[in-house]
Amino acid sequence: MLTTTGTLTHQKIGDFYTEAGATLHDVTIAYQAWGHYTGTNLIVLEHALTGDSNAISWWDGLIGPGKALDTNRYCILCTNVLGGCKGSTGPSSPHPDGKPWGSRFPALSIRDLVNAEKQLFDHLGINKIHAIIGGSMGGARTLEWAALHPHMMTTGFVIAVSARASAWQIGIQTAQISAIELDPHWNGGDYYSGHAPWEGIAAARRIAHLTYRGELEIDERFGTSAQHGENPLGPFRDPHQRFAVTSYLQHQGIKLAQRFDAGSYVVLTEALNRHDIGRGRGGLNKALSAITVPIMIAGVDTDILYPYHQQEHLSRNLGNLLAMAKISSPVGHDAFLTEFRQMERILRHFMELSEGIDDSFRTKLER
């Protein structure tokens, strides 16, 4: 039975088999849900790479009674992704032998993340989802939901992501993985009985954060300013004499290292590298055109990580485009998490459109 009190709930889903042929035993998926569940009013939110199931914390002001995602009308559910570290089975979780999975944890794809979530819903008796909404990695999962299990969802909203990982994205994401693997405490992923690779994950976050924010925003905030009380222009290089932007990025890295597991970061980043909606489906455009679920697309005009042209590509090729929206912001990729006024307006528009969708018409399209 679905728990809708907003508390973190841990649900065992049994063994899980990845699409590449690996087995995870006795998997747990954690989730949180808010609002009264009627069986037909479920909205599923898909979090980004280092997010979690507590959607109210990362979309504060958008979820609740009378808000864009109205808990008086809908039940809002968000899982912690398989491979994560916030309650779901991941590299830090116990293997059947009692030790952490560590290096034995298998590689995952975006499709695996979706299928694990589907397995959770099967255990909870959920067979109808009004809408699935996700940004960044959550957007990739939303897109795969529409390709893998269209019969379960009425509509979807895909935000700030592409149809597949680009070579640039794979390159920048692999650099982050390398930063973690080069930390001497990484130990091939088997570090849970000792010192965690905090320096590695902090460095990975510094790289990633520059892709999450806009170049204009970063430059306007920091420019070439020195960190208060420091001088980066001295006669000799000193890592303790920093530019302000360096201090800011180091702070972002430390914050993530304190709350997120490096093993999960590697597994989920690799899953993003494997993202390709066209794999095994005749290529990108054929796969997109075969999606009959009505999908709304949104992107950020200054996004470096998933440039807006990638959302335009989705909009041109999806088999059933519901609508398109642009988030205008100097912030860059993270704007879908920070531009709350724009996101509220866009989400309300999406919900209005979703309520007007004729399920019987979509069923005819699928035949």
UniProtKB/Swiss-Prot annotation:
Top-level taxonomic group: Bacteria
Pathway(s) of this molecule: Amino-acid biosynthesis; L-methionine biosynthesis via de novo pathway; O-acetyl-L-homoserine from L-homoserine: step 1/1
Residue ranges of domain AB hydrolase-1 in the record: 41-339
Protein residues bound to substrate: R205, D334
Entry-linked InterPro entries: AB_hydrolase_1, AB_hydrolase_fold, HAT_MetX-like
A GO CC annotation given for this chain: cytoplasm
Subcellular location: Cytoplasm
Xref: Pfam families: Abhydrolase_1
Catalytic activity: L-homoserine + acetyl-CoA = O-acetyl-L-homoserine + CoA
One of the GO biological process terms: homoserine metabolic process
EC number annotated for this UniProt entry: 2.3.1.31
Classification via PANTHER family: HOMOSERINE O-ACETYLTRANSFERASE
Complexes and interactors: Homodimer.
Function, as annotated: Transfers an acetyl group from acetyl-CoA to L-homoserine, forming acetyl-L-homoserine.
Protein name per Swiss-Prot or TrEMBL: Homoserine O-acetyltransferase
Native source species: Corynebacterium diphtheriae (strain ATCC 700971 / NCTC 13129 / Biotype gravis)
Biological classification of the source: Bacteria, Bacillati, Actinomycetota, Actinomycetes, Mycobacteriales
Gene: metXA
